[in-house]
Amino acid sequence: MAAVVEVEVGGGAAGERELDEVDMSDLSPEEQWRVEHARMHAKHRGHEAMHAEMVLILIATLVVAQLLLVQWKQRHPRSYNMVTLFQMWVVPLYFTVKLHWWRFLVIWILFSAVTAFVTFRATRKPLVQTTPRLVYKWFLLIYKISYATGIVGYMAVMFTLFGLNLLFKIKPEDAMDFGISLLFYGLYYGVLERDFAEMCADYMASTIGFYSESGMPTKHLSDSVCAVCGQQIFVDVSEEGIIENTYRLSCNHVFHEFCIRGWCIVGKKQTCPYCKEKVDLKRMFSNPWERPHVMYGQLLDWLRYLVAWQPVIIGVVQGINYILGLE
């Protein structure tokens, strides 16, 4: 059994020299961590006032950044959403390459390739008739996969906290890493696909002409036409469809199942695509497991801020500290 290293840090430069002379090659990973921890404390001894300034700078920057982001989102939501989506897409790529997370990189490349193709199809004019259904099916699939992955990851974390991993002879750190990884995958791709779907939904719906962001639709909606994809509806609301059913909203407008699910759940729309009347989701989705969960949506919004803007804010704080000579 390896001996336990007791690290005593002396004062000033002498203490730092003692720590620098420790041979790290013969130590266990835990002992190496203790030595590194002691070195950090020795390096920053006597910097309490400087650290207090750095904390104040961090808090002030977070408050100012939050106010600026809120104002930007309220005044120019379109540019805010586009910049946030771009950062959500590329910021993790930097950390993935830097930290050699190759599994995440492979999944990111596959998701980006298919999503780029789907987004390209959604932004073409004239819009191909099969494109809206392709877009909503793809993003609805990713939504379900990410939701299920997040649930499994959350359950793995909770089981680890309650010690149930010991029943399967799994180490707590391995079980926790597995749960947190799945939870992050589910939440990250859940945020990304919802933002892409919202952008595609607005673009396609305005191109088809039954929906406009402001003002009246440019086309009149027939009773047998879906306002999301513009295609004919062949299955009656009261009939059971072979591939998909037909849904009727509280405003009496009817839609394909995949289209309205993609519009409301994935595209984050809470109004009718044609008349903009508020959608009663509880009435439309009678099964409680199908209802979009409010807390899940709020959690995705929080993760969007964390991934897209937190690295930028931390970078600004580090730049201020560097200019002021704080460390």
Swiss-Prot record:
Domain of life: Eukaryota
SUPFAM superfamilies: RING/U-box
InterPro entries documented for this protein: RNF121/RNF175, Znf_RING, Znf_RING/FYVE/PHD
Keyword Zinc-finger: yes
A GO biological-process term: protein ubiquitination
Keywords: Acetylation, Endoplasmic reticulum, Membrane, Metal-binding, Transferase, Transmembrane, Transmembrane helix, Zinc, Zinc-finger
Chain segments annotated as transmembrane: 50-70, 79-99, 100-120, 148-168, 172-192, 306-326
EC number(s) recorded for this UniProt protein: 2.3.2.27
GO function terms (MF aspect): ubiquitin protein ligase activity; zinc ion binding
Entry GO CC: endoplasmic reticulum membrane; Golgi membrane
Pathway: Protein modification; protein ubiquitination
PROSITE patterns assigned to the protein according to its UniProt record, in alphabetical order: ZF_RING_2
Keyword Cell wall biogenesis/degradation on entry: no
SMART domains: RING
Modified residues (N-acetylalanine): A2
Zinc finger boundaries on the chain: RING-type: 226-276
Catalytic activity from the UniProt record: S-ubiquitinyl-[E2 ubiquitin-conjugating enzyme]-L-cysteine + [acceptor protein]-L-lysine = [E2 ubiquitin-conjugating enzyme]-L-cysteine + N(6)-ubiquitinyl-[acceptor protein]-L-lysine
Topology within the bilayer: Multi-pass membrane protein
Compartments (UniProt record): Endoplasmic reticulum membrane
Biological role: E3 ubiquitin ligase which accepts ubiquitin and transfers it to substrates thereby promoting their degradation by the endoplasmic reticulum-associated degradation (ERAD) pathway which is a pathway involved in ubiquitin-dependent degradation of misfolded endoplasmic reticulum proteins. May regulate the unfolded protein response to reduce endoplasmic reticulum stress.
Assigned protein family: Belongs to the RNF121 family.
Protein's name in the database: E3 ubiquitin ligase RNF121
Recorded name of the encoding gene: RNF121
